[in-house]
Curated annotation (Swiss-Prot):
The modification Phosphothreonine is found at residue 249. It comes from Arabidopsis thaliana. Gene3D superfamilies: RNA Polymerase Primary Sigma Factor, Winged helix-like DNA-binding domain superfamily/Winged helix DNA-binding domain. This is RNA polymerase sigma factor sigF, chloroplastic. Induction: Induced by red light. Slightly induced by blue light. The keyword Ubl conjugation does not apply. Residues 62-79 have a biased composition (Basic and acidic residues). GO terms for cellular component: chloroplast; plastid.
Protein backbone atom coordinates (compact mmCIF):
# COMPACT_ATOMS: atom_id res chain seq x y z
CA UNK A 1 0.00 0.00 0.00
CA UNK A 2 2.96 2.29 0.51
CA UNK A 3 3.92 1.83 -3.17
CA UNK A 4 0.34 2.30 -4.23
CA UNK A 5 0.04 5.56 -2.36
CA UNK A 6 3.28 6.88 -3.84
CA UNK A 7 2.22 5.96 -7.37
CA UNK A 8 -1.17 7.60 -6.96
CA UNK A 9 0.38 10.81 -5.65
CA UNK A 10 2.99 11.00 -8.41
CA UNK A 11 1.41 9.65 -11.62
CA UNK A 12 -0.25 12.44 -13.66
CA UNK A 13 -1.57 10.21 -16.42
CA UNK A 14 -4.47 8.71 -14.42
CA UNK A 15 -6.42 11.85 -13.65
CA UNK A 16 -10.05 12.68 -14.10
CA UNK A 17 -11.51 15.26 -16.48
CA UNK A 18 -10.90 18.16 -14.17
CA UNK A 19 -7.13 17.48 -13.98
CA UNK A 20 -6.63 16.11 -17.44
CA UNK A 21 -5.47 19.47 -18.75
CA UNK A 22 -2.56 19.71 -16.34
CA UNK A 23 -1.39 16.17 -16.99
CA UNK A 24 -0.15 16.72 -20.54
CA UNK A 25 0.03 20.47 -21.02
CA UNK A 26 3.62 20.60 -19.74
CA UNK A 27 6.50 18.13 -19.40
CA UNK A 28 7.08 19.22 -15.78
CA UNK A 29 4.76 16.45 -14.64
CA UNK A 30 7.19 13.89 -16.05
CA UNK A 31 10.05 15.42 -14.07
CA UNK A 32 8.02 15.26 -10.88
CA UNK A 33 7.29 11.60 -11.55
CA UNK A 34 10.96 10.62 -11.55
CA UNK A 35 11.63 12.70 -8.48
CA UNK A 36 8.85 11.07 -6.52
CA UNK A 37 9.97 7.52 -7.29
CA UNK A 38 13.03 8.10 -5.13
CA UNK A 39 11.41 10.32 -2.53
CA UNK A 40 7.70 9.54 -2.18
CA UNK A 41 5.68 12.59 -1.34
CA UNK A 42 1.89 12.55 -1.26
CA UNK A 43 0.28 15.09 -3.59
CA UNK A 44 -3.05 15.70 -1.99
CA UNK A 45 -4.56 17.31 -5.08
CA UNK A 46 -4.13 14.24 -7.30
CA UNK A 47 -4.97 11.94 -4.41
CA UNK A 48 -8.28 13.66 -3.81
CA UNK A 49 -9.16 13.58 -7.51
CA UNK A 50 -8.29 9.90 -7.89
CA UNK A 51 -10.01 8.85 -4.69
CA UNK A 52 -13.34 9.57 -6.33
CA UNK A 53 -12.82 6.68 -8.78
CA UNK A 54 -11.20 4.05 -6.48
CA UNK A 55 -13.45 1.34 -5.07
CA UNK A 56 -14.57 1.61 -1.46
CA UNK A 57 -12.78 -1.66 -0.55
CA UNK A 58 -9.40 -0.26 -1.53
CA UNK A 59 -10.01 2.97 0.31
CA UNK A 60 -11.11 1.08 3.41
CA UNK A 61 -8.08 -1.22 3.35
CA UNK A 62 -5.64 1.62 3.18
CA UNK A 63 -6.29 3.05 6.68
CA UNK A 64 -6.19 -0.48 8.20
CA UNK A 65 -2.80 -1.18 6.69
CA UNK A 66 -1.52 2.27 7.52
CA UNK A 67 -2.51 1.94 11.16
CA UNK A 68 0.35 -0.42 11.85
CA UNK A 69 3.22 1.86 10.81
CA UNK A 70 1.39 4.94 12.06
CA UNK A 71 1.04 3.47 15.56
CA UNK A 72 4.77 3.81 15.96
CA UNK A 73 4.73 7.32 14.41
CA UNK A 74 2.08 8.63 16.77
CA UNK A 75 4.53 8.36 19.62
CA UNK A 76 6.21 11.41 18.28
CA UNK A 77 3.65 14.22 18.79
CA UNK A 78 5.59 16.71 16.82
CA UNK A 79 5.73 14.54 13.69
CA UNK A 80 2.02 13.76 13.78
CA UNK A 81 1.09 17.41 14.27
CA UNK A 82 3.20 18.47 11.29
CA UNK A 83 1.67 15.74 9.13
CA UNK A 84 -1.89 16.77 9.97
CA UNK A 85 -1.18 20.43 9.35
CA UNK A 86 0.41 19.65 5.99
CA UNK A 87 -2.54 17.49 4.92
CA UNK A 88 -5.01 20.21 5.88
CA UNK A 89 -3.00 22.79 3.98
CA UNK A 90 -2.74 20.54 0.90
CA UNK A 91 -6.47 19.85 0.95
CA UNK A 92 -7.25 23.57 1.16
CA UNK A 93 -4.88 24.40 -1.72
CA UNK A 94 -6.17 21.54 -3.89
CA UNK A 95 -9.80 22.53 -3.33
CA UNK A 96 -9.08 26.10 -4.41
CA UNK A 97 -7.14 24.94 -7.46
CA UNK A 98 -9.97 22.57 -8.40
CA UNK A 99 -12.49 25.40 -8.25
CA UNK A 100 -10.31 27.65 -10.41
CA UNK A 101 -9.67 24.90 -12.94
CA UNK A 102 -13.37 24.04 -13.20
CA UNK A 103 -14.22 27.70 -13.80
CA UNK A 104 -11.63 27.82 -16.60
CA UNK A 105 -13.10 24.70 -18.19
CA UNK A 106 -16.58 26.20 -18.05
CA UNK A 107 -15.39 29.32 -19.89
CA UNK A 108 -13.46 27.28 -22.49
CA UNK A 109 -16.20 25.76 -24.64
CA UNK A 110 -14.14 23.47 -26.85
CA UNK A 111 -11.80 21.83 -24.33
CA UNK A 112 -13.85 18.73 -23.55
CA UNK A 113 -14.28 17.67 -27.18
CA UNK A 114 -10.67 18.45 -28.07
CA UNK A 115 -8.72 17.03 -25.19
CA UNK A 116 -10.72 14.64 -23.04
CA UNK A 117 -12.15 12.30 -25.69
CA UNK A 118 -8.85 10.77 -26.94
CA UNK A 119 -7.53 10.19 -23.43
CA UNK A 120 -10.60 8.83 -21.71
CA UNK A 121 -10.76 6.04 -24.31
CA UNK A 122 -7.21 4.95 -23.53
CA UNK A 123 -6.99 5.40 -19.71
CA UNK A 124 -9.51 3.47 -17.68
CA UNK A 125 -9.04 4.09 -13.96
CA UNK A 126 -10.94 1.12 -12.58
CA UNK A 127 -8.82 -1.24 -14.72
CA UNK A 128 -5.62 0.20 -13.26
CA UNK A 129 -6.73 0.22 -9.65
CA UNK A 130 -6.61 -3.53 -9.19
CA UNK A 131 -2.93 -3.99 -10.24
CA UNK A 132 -1.94 -0.87 -8.37
CA UNK A 133 -3.43 -2.13 -5.15
CA UNK A 134 -1.09 -5.19 -5.09
CA UNK A 135 1.97 -3.58 -6.68
CA UNK A 136 5.31 -3.87 -4.96
CA UNK A 137 7.89 -1.17 -4.52
CA UNK A 138 10.04 -2.71 -7.26
CA UNK A 139 7.22 -2.30 -9.79
CA UNK A 140 6.94 1.46 -9.21
CA UNK A 141 9.69 2.23 -11.73
CA UNK A 142 8.02 0.11 -14.42
CA UNK A 143 4.67 1.73 -13.77
CA UNK A 144 6.30 5.15 -13.86
CA UNK A 145 7.79 4.37 -17.25
CA UNK A 146 4.35 3.35 -18.51
CA UNK A 147 2.93 6.60 -17.14
CA UNK A 148 5.71 8.52 -18.89
CA UNK A 149 4.92 6.85 -22.23
CA UNK A 150 1.22 7.58 -21.74
CA UNK A 151 1.96 11.24 -21.03
CA UNK A 152 4.10 11.42 -24.18
CA UNK A 153 1.26 9.96 -26.22
CA UNK A 154 -1.11 12.52 -24.70
CA UNK A 155 1.30 15.31 -25.62
CA UNK A 156 1.43 14.04 -29.21
CA UNK A 157 -2.36 14.01 -29.33
CA UNK A 158 -2.42 17.60 -28.10
CA UNK A 159 0.04 18.57 -30.85
CA UNK A 160 -2.24 17.03 -33.47
CA UNK A 161 -5.38 18.69 -32.13
CA UNK A 162 -3.71 22.08 -31.88
CA UNK A 163 -2.84 22.15 -35.59
CA UNK A 164 -5.89 24.33 -36.48
CA UNK A 165 -7.42 25.68 -33.28
CA UNK A 166 -8.49 29.24 -32.67
CA UNK A 167 -6.34 31.63 -30.68
CA UNK A 168 -8.69 31.76 -27.71
CA UNK A 169 -8.48 27.95 -27.22
CA UNK A 170 -4.69 28.11 -27.33
CA UNK A 171 -4.62 30.90 -24.77
CA UNK A 172 -6.98 29.02 -22.47
CA UNK A 173 -4.86 25.85 -22.75
CA UNK A 174 -1.66 27.69 -21.93
CA UNK A 175 -3.30 29.57 -19.05
CA UNK A 176 -4.86 26.50 -17.48
CA UNK A 177 -1.67 24.45 -17.86
CA UNK A 178 0.41 27.16 -16.23
CA UNK A 179 -2.04 27.43 -13.32
CA UNK A 180 -2.21 23.66 -12.75
CA UNK A 181 1.57 23.09 -12.55
CA UNK A 182 2.83 22.01 -9.12
CA UNK A 183 4.88 24.50 -7.22
CA UNK A 184 7.67 22.05 -6.37
CA UNK A 185 10.21 20.57 -8.74
CA UNK A 186 11.99 21.87 -11.79
CA UNK A 187 9.78 23.34 -14.53
CA UNK A 188 10.79 22.63 -18.13
CA UNK A 189 9.29 25.13 -20.58
CA UNK A 190 8.41 23.77 -24.03
CA UNK A 191 9.03 25.87 -27.13
CA UNK A 192 6.56 23.96 -29.28
CA UNK A 193 3.70 26.27 -28.44
CA UNK A 194 5.69 29.35 -29.45
CA UNK A 195 6.71 27.65 -32.70
CA UNK A 196 3.10 26.74 -33.46
CA UNK A 197 1.93 30.29 -32.80
CA UNK A 198 4.60 31.72 -35.10
CA UNK A 199 3.66 29.20 -37.79
CA UNK A 200 -0.04 30.07 -37.51
CA UNK A 201 0.75 33.78 -37.83
CA UNK A 202 2.65 33.18 -41.08
CA UNK A 203 0.04 30.83 -42.53
CA UNK A 204 -2.96 32.47 -44.29
CA UNK A 205 -6.30 32.02 -42.60
CA UNK A 206 -8.90 30.21 -44.68
CA UNK A 207 -12.62 30.91 -44.59
CA UNK A 208 -13.49 27.25 -45.12
CA UNK A 209 -15.08 25.05 -42.49
CA UNK A 210 -12.59 23.67 -39.92
CA UNK A 211 -12.27 19.99 -38.94
CA UNK A 212 -14.33 20.58 -35.82
CA UNK A 213 -17.19 21.98 -37.90
CA UNK A 214 -16.50 25.61 -37.04
CA UNK A 215 -18.03 27.95 -39.59
CA UNK A 216 -16.87 31.60 -39.50
CA UNK A 217 -19.65 34.08 -38.92
CA UNK A 218 -20.65 36.64 -41.52
CA UNK A 219 -18.94 39.96 -41.45
CA UNK A 220 -20.97 42.58 -39.67
CA UNK A 221 -22.15 45.77 -41.35
CA UNK A 222 -19.54 47.94 -39.66
CA UNK A 223 -16.70 45.67 -40.79
CA UNK A 224 -18.02 45.77 -44.35
CA UNK A 225 -17.99 49.55 -44.36
CA UNK A 226 -14.50 49.64 -42.87
CA UNK A 227 -13.16 47.43 -45.64
CA UNK A 228 -13.78 50.16 -48.21
CA UNK A 229 -16.00 50.56 -51.24
CA UNK A 230 -15.46 49.97 -54.90
CA UNK A 231 -14.79 53.27 -56.65
CA UNK A 232 -16.68 52.09 -59.75
CA UNK A 233 -19.89 51.29 -57.87
CA UNK A 234 -21.89 54.53 -57.80
CA UNK A 235 -24.63 53.08 -55.62
CA UNK A 236 -22.22 51.79 -52.98
CA UNK A 237 -20.43 55.13 -52.83
CA UNK A 238 -23.73 57.00 -52.61
CA UNK A 239 -25.03 54.85 -49.74
CA UNK A 240 -21.70 54.85 -47.92
CA UNK A 241 -21.98 54.67 -44.14
CA UNK A 242 -24.31 52.88 -41.73
CA UNK A 243 -26.43 56.02 -41.28
CA UNK A 244 -28.09 55.43 -44.64
CA UNK A 245 -29.46 52.08 -43.40
CA UNK A 246 -31.24 53.47 -40.35
CA UNK A 247 -34.94 54.24 -40.62
CA UNK A 248 -36.43 57.04 -38.57
CA UNK A 249 -39.52 56.66 -36.48
CA UNK A 250 -42.28 59.25 -36.56
CA UNK A 251 -41.16 60.64 -33.22
CA UNK A 252 -37.53 60.98 -34.28
CA UNK A 253 -38.56 62.53 -37.58
CA UNK A 254 -40.75 65.12 -35.84
CA UNK A 255 -37.92 66.01 -33.48
CA UNK A 256 -35.43 66.47 -36.32
CA UNK A 257 -37.88 68.59 -38.30
CA UNK A 258 -38.50 70.86 -35.31
CA UNK A 259 -34.75 71.47 -35.00
CA UNK A 260 -34.52 72.19 -38.73
CA UNK A 261 -37.43 74.63 -38.57
CA UNK A 262 -35.69 76.50 -35.76
CA UNK A 263 -32.48 76.63 -37.82
CA UNK A 264 -34.39 78.07 -40.78
CA UNK A 265 -35.72 80.83 -38.53
CA UNK A 266 -32.19 81.64 -37.40
CA UNK A 267 -30.95 81.79 -41.00
CA UNK A 268 -33.87 84.02 -41.96
CA UNK A 269 -32.92 86.51 -39.23
CA UNK A 270 -29.30 86.38 -40.39
CA UNK A 271 -30.32 87.16 -43.98
CA UNK A 272 -32.36 90.11 -42.76
CA UNK A 273 -29.40 91.48 -40.81
CA UNK A 274 -27.17 91.12 -43.88
CA UNK A 275 -29.57 93.15 -46.00
CA UNK A 276 -29.81 95.86 -43.34
CA UNK A 277 -26.11 96.19 -42.48
CA UNK A 278 -24.67 95.31 -45.87
CA UNK A 279 -22.33 92.71 -44.36
CA UNK A 280 -22.51 89.41 -42.56
CA UNK A 281 -23.45 89.85 -38.87
CA UNK A 282 -21.27 88.56 -36.06
CA UNK A 283 -22.35 85.87 -33.64
CA UNK A 284 -23.00 88.48 -30.98
CA UNK A 285 -25.21 90.59 -33.25
CA UNK A 286 -27.02 87.51 -34.44
CA UNK A 287 -27.64 86.29 -30.89
CA UNK A 288 -28.78 89.76 -29.80
CA UNK A 289 -31.28 89.89 -32.66
CA UNK A 290 -32.67 86.51 -31.59
CA UNK A 291 -32.72 87.44 -27.90
CA UNK A 292 -30.46 84.58 -26.79
CA UNK A 293 -26.85 84.20 -25.73
CA UNK A 294 -24.01 83.32 -28.08
CA UNK A 295 -23.39 79.80 -26.65
CA UNK A 296 -27.08 78.98 -26.99
CA UNK A 297 -27.06 80.28 -30.58
CA UNK A 298 -24.05 78.14 -31.48
CA UNK A 299 -25.69 75.11 -29.89
CA UNK A 300 -28.92 75.68 -31.84
CA UNK A 301 -27.03 76.09 -35.12
CA UNK A 302 -25.02 72.91 -34.58
CA UNK A 303 -28.09 70.94 -33.55
CA UNK A 304 -30.09 72.17 -36.55
CA UNK A 305 -27.36 71.37 -39.07
CA UNK A 306 -26.74 67.91 -37.63
CA UNK A 307 -30.49 67.22 -37.68
CA UNK A 308 -30.74 68.29 -41.31
CA UNK A 309 -27.82 66.07 -42.26
CA UNK A 310 -29.29 63.11 -40.40
CA UNK A 311 -32.71 63.56 -42.03
CA UNK A 312 -31.18 63.78 -45.51
CA UNK A 313 -28.92 60.75 -44.95
CA UNK A 314 -31.80 58.63 -43.69
CA UNK A 315 -33.80 59.28 -46.90
CA UNK A 316 -31.06 58.67 -49.47
CA UNK A 317 -32.48 55.24 -50.24
CA UNK A 318 -35.66 56.99 -51.43
CA UNK A 319 -33.51 58.91 -53.93
CA UNK A 320 -32.05 55.62 -55.20
CA UNK A 321 -35.53 54.12 -55.57
CA UNK A 322 -36.77 57.04 -57.69
CA UNK A 323 -33.56 57.38 -59.74
CA UNK A 324 -33.76 53.73 -60.84
CA UNK A 325 -37.10 54.47 -62.52
CA UNK A 326 -35.47 57.04 -64.86
CA UNK A 327 -32.45 55.09 -66.06
CA UNK A 328 -31.52 54.94 -69.77
CA UNK A 329 -33.12 58.30 -70.54
CA UNK A 330 -30.04 60.29 -71.45
CA UNK A 331 -28.40 60.70 -68.01
CA UNK A 332 -26.19 58.20 -66.23
CA UNK A 333 -27.07 56.86 -62.81
CA UNK A 334 -24.64 59.11 -60.92
CA UNK A 335 -26.18 62.27 -62.38
CA UNK A 336 -29.65 61.01 -61.49
CA UNK A 337 -28.57 60.43 -57.89
CA UNK A 338 -27.07 63.91 -57.65
CA UNK A 339 -30.16 65.60 -59.04
CA UNK A 340 -32.37 63.56 -56.73
CA UNK A 341 -30.24 64.59 -53.74
CA UNK A 342 -30.72 68.24 -54.67
CA UNK A 343 -34.47 67.71 -54.73
CA UNK A 344 -34.28 66.00 -51.34
CA UNK A 345 -32.40 68.93 -49.82
CA UNK A 346 -34.93 71.35 -51.25
CA UNK A 347 -37.79 69.32 -49.77
CA UNK A 348 -36.18 69.63 -46.32
CA UNK A 349 -36.42 73.41 -46.58
CA UNK A 350 -39.97 73.41 -47.99
CA UNK A 351 -41.54 70.80 -45.71
CA UNK A 352 -44.18 71.97 -43.26
CA UNK A 353 -45.11 69.67 -40.37
CA UNK A 354 -48.66 71.07 -40.45
CA UNK A 355 -49.32 69.27 -43.76
CA UNK A 356 -50.20 66.10 -41.83
CA UNK A 357 -48.03 63.64 -43.79
CA UNK A 358 -44.67 61.98 -43.33
CA UNK A 359 -41.57 63.62 -44.71
CA UNK A 360 -40.88 60.82 -47.22
CA UNK A 361 -44.31 61.32 -48.83
CA UNK A 362 -43.60 65.01 -49.32
CA UNK A 363 -39.99 64.54 -50.46
CA UNK A 364 -40.95 61.97 -53.10
CA UNK A 365 -42.46 64.61 -55.42
CA UNK A 366 -39.56 67.03 -55.04
CA UNK A 367 -37.04 64.30 -55.87
CA UNK A 368 -39.08 63.19 -58.88
CA UNK A 369 -39.50 66.75 -60.15
CA UNK A 370 -35.77 67.48 -59.84
CA UNK A 371 -34.78 64.33 -61.76
CA UNK A 372 -37.33 64.93 -64.55
CA UNK A 373 -36.26 68.55 -64.95
CA UNK A 374 -32.63 67.53 -65.25
CA UNK A 375 -33.51 64.97 -67.93
CA UNK A 376 -35.43 67.60 -69.93
CA UNK A 377 -32.54 70.05 -69.85
CA UNK A 378 -29.39 67.93 -70.01
CA UNK A 379 -30.18 64.58 -71.60
CA UNK A 380 -29.84 65.76 -75.24
CA UNK A 381 -27.43 67.89 -77.21
CA UNK A 382 -30.37 69.96 -78.43
CA UNK A 383 -32.75 70.72 -75.58
CA UNK A 384 -36.38 69.81 -76.15
CA UNK A 385 -39.38 71.28 -74.31
CA UNK A 386 -41.22 69.26 -71.70
CA UNK A 387 -44.34 68.72 -73.82
CA UNK A 388 -42.22 67.07 -76.52
CA UNK A 389 -40.80 64.70 -73.91
CA UNK A 390 -44.31 63.87 -72.78
CA UNK A 391 -45.31 63.07 -76.36
CA UNK A 392 -42.21 60.91 -76.84
CA UNK A 393 -43.14 59.01 -73.70
CA UNK A 394 -46.58 58.30 -75.12
CA UNK A 395 -45.02 57.02 -78.35
CA UNK A 396 -42.76 54.70 -76.37
CA UNK A 397 -45.72 53.37 -74.40
CA UNK A 398 -47.63 52.83 -77.64
CA UNK A 399 -44.75 50.74 -79.03
CA UNK A 400 -44.71 48.58 -75.88
CA UNK A 401 -48.46 48.06 -76.14
CA UNK A 402 -48.17 46.94 -79.77
CA UNK A 403 -45.39 44.50 -78.88
CA UNK A 404 -47.49 43.02 -76.08
CA UNK A 405 -50.33 42.54 -78.54
CA UNK A 406 -48.03 40.63 -80.93
CA UNK A 407 -47.27 43.41 -83.40
CA UNK A 408 -43.49 43.64 -83.15
CA UNK A 409 -43.13 46.18 -85.98
CA UNK A 410 -45.98 48.69 -85.68
CA UNK A 411 -46.44 51.16 -88.51
CA UNK A 412 -46.56 54.93 -88.09
CA UNK A 413 -50.31 54.93 -88.66
CA UNK A 414 -50.82 52.46 -85.79
CA UNK A 415 -48.57 54.45 -83.47
CA UNK A 416 -50.33 57.69 -84.37
CA UNK A 417 -53.68 56.03 -83.64
CA UNK A 418 -52.55 54.89 -80.18
CA UNK A 419 -51.03 58.28 -79.33
CA UNK A 420 -53.93 60.29 -80.75
CA UNK A 421 -52.00 62.49 -83.22
CA UNK A 422 -51.82 62.69 -87.00
CA UNK A 423 -49.22 60.83 -89.03
CA UNK A 424 -47.62 64.09 -90.23
CA UNK A 425 -47.18 65.31 -86.66
CA UNK A 426 -45.68 61.97 -85.65
CA UNK A 427 -43.21 62.13 -88.56
CA UNK A 428 -42.20 65.64 -87.60
CA UNK A 429 -41.80 64.60 -83.96
CA UNK A 430 -39.58 61.65 -84.79
CA UNK A 431 -37.54 63.76 -87.21
CA UNK A 432 -36.91 66.54 -84.69
CA UNK A 433 -36.05 64.19 -81.85
CA UNK A 434 -33.35 62.25 -83.67
CA UNK A 435 -30.19 61.68 -81.66
CA UNK A 436 -27.23 63.45 -83.30
CA UNK A 437 -24.04 61.49 -83.88
CA UNK A 438 -20.50 62.78 -83.60
CA UNK A 439 -18.51 62.89 -86.84
CA UNK A 440 -15.46 61.68 -84.88
CA UNK A 441 -17.25 58.56 -83.66
CA UNK A 442 -15.83 55.28 -85.05
CA UNK A 443 -18.14 53.37 -87.34
CA UNK A 444 -16.93 49.93 -86.23
CA UNK A 445 -15.58 49.06 -82.84
CA UNK A 446 -12.56 47.19 -84.22
CA UNK A 447 -11.49 49.94 -86.64
CA UNK A 448 -10.57 53.62 -86.42
CA UNK A 449 -12.64 54.75 -89.41
CA UNK A 450 -14.90 57.65 -88.43
CA UNK A 451 -18.09 59.04 -89.95
CA UNK A 452 -16.18 62.11 -91.10
CA UNK A 453 -13.98 60.01 -93.38
CA UNK A 454 -16.85 58.36 -95.25
CA UNK A 455 -19.45 61.19 -95.26
CA UNK A 456 -19.37 63.27 -98.48
CA UNK A 457 -19.27 67.08 -98.34
CA UNK A 458 -22.37 68.46 -100.01
CA UNK A 459 -20.68 71.86 -100.56
CA UNK A 460 -18.13 70.40 -102.97
CA UNK A 461 -19.27 69.64 -106.54
CA UNK A 462 -18.55 66.33 -108.11
CA UNK A 463 -16.36 66.32 -111.24
CA UNK A 464 -19.31 65.31 -113.41
CA UNK A 465 -21.46 68.19 -112.20
CA UNK A 466 -18.60 70.66 -112.52
CA UNK A 467 -17.97 69.70 -116.18
CA UNK A 468 -21.71 69.79 -116.94
CA UNK A 469 -22.06 73.31 -115.57
CA UNK A 470 -19.08 74.52 -117.57
CA UNK A 471 -20.58 73.15 -120.78
CA UNK A 472 -23.92 74.81 -119.94
CA UNK A 473 -22.23 78.22 -119.50
CA UNK A 474 -20.53 77.96 -122.89
CA UNK A 475 -23.80 76.93 -124.51
CA UNK A 476 -25.65 79.90 -122.97
CA UNK A 477 -23.00 82.33 -124.25
CA UNK A 478 -23.39 80.92 -127.72
CA UNK A 479 -27.16 81.30 -127.45
CA UNK A 480 -26.83 84.99 -126.51
CA UNK A 481 -25.18 85.67 -129.83
CA UNK A 482 -28.62 85.64 -131.50
CA UNK A 483 -29.44 88.90 -129.63
CA UNK A 484 -28.37 92.41 -130.44
CA UNK A 485 -25.46 93.81 -128.44
CA UNK A 486 -27.75 96.11 -126.44
CA UNK A 487 -30.17 93.28 -125.59
CA UNK A 488 -27.27 90.94 -124.79
CA UNK A 489 -25.82 93.52 -122.36
CA UNK A 490 -29.16 94.10 -120.64
CA UNK A 491 -29.69 90.32 -120.13
CA UNK A 492 -26.19 89.91 -118.65
CA UNK A 493 -26.70 92.82 -116.22
CA UNK A 494 -30.20 91.70 -115.30
CA UNK A 495 -29.26 88.07 -114.43
CA UNK A 496 -25.63 88.56 -113.31
CA UNK A 497 -24.02 86.47 -116.04
CA UNK A 498 -20.18 86.38 -116.25
CA UNK A 499 -19.71 86.82 -112.52
CA UNK A 500 -21.51 90.09 -112.08
CA UNK A 501 -24.29 90.81 -109.63
CA UNK A 502 -27.92 91.17 -110.63
CA UNK A 503 -29.06 94.74 -111.42
CA UNK A 504 -32.51 96.24 -111.12
CA UNK A 505 -34.40 97.92 -113.95
CA UNK A 506 -33.74 101.42 -112.61
CA UNK A 507 -29.98 100.75 -112.34
CA UNK A 508 -29.85 99.45 -115.93
CA UNK A 509 -31.89 102.51 -117.09
CA UNK A 510 -29.39 104.87 -115.46
CA UNK A 511 -26.52 103.13 -117.26
CA UNK A 512 -28.14 103.43 -120.71
CA UNK A 513 -30.14 106.63 -120.07
CA UNK A 514 -33.44 104.82 -120.44
CA UNK A 515 -36.55 104.62 -118.38
CA UNK A 516 -37.49 101.55 -116.38
CA UNK A 517 -40.35 100.74 -118.72
CA UNK A 518 -38.10 100.85 -121.77
CA UNK A 519 -35.59 98.52 -120.09
CA UNK A 520 -38.39 96.09 -119.21
CA UNK A 521 -39.60 96.07 -122.84
CA UNK A 522 -36.10 95.29 -124.13
CA UNK A 523 -35.72 92.50 -121.57
CA UNK A 524 -39.05 90.92 -122.54
CA UNK A 525 -38.19 90.99 -126.24
CA UNK A 526 -34.77 89.41 -125.61
CA UNK A 527 -36.22 86.58 -123.49
CA UNK A 528 -38.84 85.84 -126.15
CA UNK A 529 -36.16 85.48 -128.83
CA UNK A 530 -34.13 83.18 -126.56
CA UNK A 531 -37.15 80.92 -126.00
CA UNK A 532 -37.67 80.69 -129.72
CA UNK A 533 -34.12 79.38 -130.24
CA UNK A 534 -33.79 77.24 -127.08
CA UNK A 535 -35.39 74.11 -128.58
CA UNK A 536 -33.07 74.20 -131.57
CA UNK A 537 -29.94 74.36 -129.34
CA UNK A 538 -31.03 71.49 -127.03
CA UNK A 539 -30.77 73.38 -123.71
CA UNK A 540 -33.37 71.09 -122.10
CA UNK A 541 -30.50 68.66 -121.34
CA UNK A 542 -29.24 71.07 -118.64
CA UNK A 543 -32.48 71.13 -116.67
CA UNK A 544 -31.06 68.84 -113.95
CA UNK A 545 -28.13 71.21 -113.34
CA UNK A 546 -30.35 74.21 -112.58
CA UNK A 547 -30.82 74.87 -108.89
Amino acid sequence: MEATRNLVSSSPSFQTKTHLKSSYSSPSSVVMLHDQTTTPVVNSRHLNSLSRHFPASVLSQEPREESRPLSHALRDDRTSQLTLERRQFDELVSSREDEKFEQQLLHSTGLWNLLISPLTSETKLPAVVSPLADAELCDVVALAQKALSASKQAALLVDDTEANPSDNIKDSLSTSSSMSLPEKGNIVRSKRQLERRAKNRRAPKSNDVDDEGYVPQKTSAKKKYKQGADNDDALQLFLWGPETKQLLTAKEEAELISHIQHLLKLEKVKTKLESQNGCEPTIGEWAEAMGISSPVLKSDIHRGRSSREKLITANLRLVVHIAKQYQNRGLNFQDLLQEGSMGLMKSVEKFKPQSGCRFATYAYWWIRQSIRKSIFQNSRTIRLPENVYMLLGKVSEARKTCVQEGNYRPSKEELAGHVGVSTEKLDKLLYNTRTPLSMQQPIWSDQDTTFQEITPDSGIETPTMSVGKQLMRNHVRNLLNVLSPKERRIIKLRFGIDGGKQRSLSEIGEIYGLSKERVRQLESRALYRLKQNMNSHGLHAYADLLV
